[in-house]
């Protein structure tokens, strides 16, 4: 999907297909935003469908020019948005966070999913199934090498179940996500 001639990454859609959350490069004054290590920063956006066009493209309020917010995933009830970020409060290089989506379309305060999921390394690319299982990539949990795909059950009380490496053939000695 291209909006404003800028490519979108990792789109996730509401069940009715009328709202899309997606990742974009962080452009600052017409240039790609970068951190002090020259890494391109990312931001999350929301767009709504009007007929056959995507409109009302808005930047999510917890984005920043100082860190990345990327890779959105929706909970089955569409009331929680999961994402990866290196925002303040991150335990490692990047962590999985969640934020509530309020009935009026506003957002709560992003919450780090904690040290059962997040490590001192990278956790990224969350995906939530209809059964409330969270799949994510990590190179901080024991794996086969590089980023591996892991799964855990998201519980109604906000806790998570045990973390399981999904194993081969999904995971390899290379980065898998």
What are these model-derived regions, one by one?
Residues 1-177:
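Short, conserved micro-motifs composed of acidic
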